């Protein structure tokens, strides 16, 4: 079986139906470059508007649906279908064919085979799944557009970052602990003509590459803070109680594997309490000599808010395995470490100083991305800017808060309904009497200020 020929023939078939264009239209022009997946309902609605044969093909590729064998064979040919079955990309089921728990994501001019997301019908989330998400796209957008001799990607997953790096480098090493992801990323490298430059390694972080050094090292590691005794969360996400279990080993290995004048780029999420940032403390300890480091902190939110989101996600994805008291377990974990806030980060480190103390900057890009940030604002002086996924409120160059559709809906409820809605939030977050009183006071003041400032009218005018 010639794997390379089979996968390149598969790509030709996707090209024949202009899959890149169709995927972009189906997923929406904004979502297409921000998130690999639109909601299933939105995808189904868009696909149903296509001609019948094309609609069936897009259900097969975008949603991973089982489709009549004759339709797929007519499109791809019997030989290619049989070859893809032998390869493990397609499976047979009583006269139907479907991708084997995969979907085909289109990004820029690439085709990526990844596992069907858990929020699609029939999707699952397992430790061996090949993950791609908004964080993958965020890292892709931050990649430097200049030539590198040798690149290394740690926790390479689907291989998309190494495929991108291959365009601007002589060679790329990609390391992944998940053996299934290694196999699928080898498919993706072939499909996207990167297999001659990208060298895949199955193993744990730096172990497979031994003493090799690189001009660029990038990583999108497991970073979700999660109780270590709860084992249902997949290894592609869970990062230990502070989210630093994997990150710690990556940071401490940089000195050995990053060349002089080399660059390190990593994205992730973390927890903090004001200026007590475990992620920053790790960096200061491990990289105290020879580096220029910028840690960009953004999308900060109250940990209670994050806990509710995480608990709901766990129930929706692993309902049978999620403990009923998941919120309590998550809050207890964060309380053990005295953490109060959740954030996203981008870390850029350049190895440019010899025998000089590291210059380390912590840069907070925005304050809060929720209605709780609004009450701090002088709304009469705010400028409202429409961004792809939310409305941003600025005072000068300072982002005060963001307003998404949920907040717009809340504001439209007016007076009493707003307080009822706020009480529901308090219940979800298990606020005590003092926290409840303070939160309700903030929301009540915010609602009056927003109505007074005609915020809804201003948003409608954008």
Predicted regions, residues:
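Conserved SAM-binding motif I beta-strand of class I
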Residues: 171-176
